[in-house]
């Protein structure tokens, strides 16, 4: 059973979709080697650690502004263009 419970975590991020996105993105960062913001002495799985981080208020989310979305899209487009150029 996941501790903390989903209901406890939903008190911090009240939208299930945002919660899943936030936890999964943080879990991927933990898998990639980032240090946890909460104690992980028992070597729990990354999703459990990320869930505890959200429940403790160490991790949260925010929606991007329109300007930030445009910047991210432009950056992504530039990366794709560079990747295509390197493959040719």
Curated annotation (Swiss-Prot):
It comes from the Bacteria. InterPro entries: DNA-dir_RNA_pol_omega, Pol_omega/Rpo6/RPB6, RPB6/omega-like_sf. One of its GO terms (biological process) is DNA-templated transcription. Its EC number is 2.7.7.6. The keyword Transferase applies. GO terms for cellular component: DNA-directed RNA polymerase complex. Keywords: DNA-directed RNA polymerase, Nucleotidyltransferase, Transcription, Transferase. HAMAP family: RNApol_bact_RpoZ. Promotes RNA polymerase assembly. Latches the N- and C-terminal regions of the beta' subunit thereby facilitating its interaction with the beta and alpha subunits. This is DNA-directed RNA polymerase subunit omega. The gene is rpoZ.
